[in-house]
Amino acid sequence: MENVNLTNHFLIAMPGMVDPNFNGTLTYICDHSDQGALGVVVNRPIDLDLSTLFEQIGLSLPEGLHGEIVYFGGPVQTERGFVLHTPPLTFSSTLTVNDAVSLTTSKDVLEAVSQGAGPEKFIVSLGYAGWSAGQLEDELKQNAWLSVAADPQVIFDLAPEERLPAAMKLLGIDFASLSDEAGHA
């Protein structure tokens, strides 16, 4: 498991996940190396909408985006925005994950959205999920997560409550059939 790279994969929290930050979550891994991993939870809306967030940071929001929600991205730096979006636009702090997904943490992406010049598809999260070197690999060995190659349509085209079941379907598994008991062959 040491040589596995989970960049551009989903992590599906197993039913027995005891950490309330991740119970029932689908996390998109933006970067994974021997230094650790960085991901964003993509299926946990918080009690904040995009129009309120934009108002708080002094930006106007185009009319068609007023109902959009903000997500809990993870328990690290929860006061900071993390925007998953489609390329090709890049901003001052954009990490291009692949040709379908980028991650930006600088305010200029939100300024572009405010001006109607932002990415075609995006979700805004507060916070991120981070793992130190070897930590994610250890959690995988302990059966805390399932992993599957990510499909950007799950992130950008489905409602939050549809994302976890859709990721499970990529594995060919019905989430309801999973046990919270760990086992090893």
Swiss-Prot record:
Pfam families per the UniProt record, alphabetical: DUF179
GO cellular component: cytosol
Family per record: Belongs to the UPF0301 (AlgH) family.
Organism: Thiobacillus denitrificans (strain ATCC 25259 / T1)
Full protein name: UPF0301 protein Tbd_2579
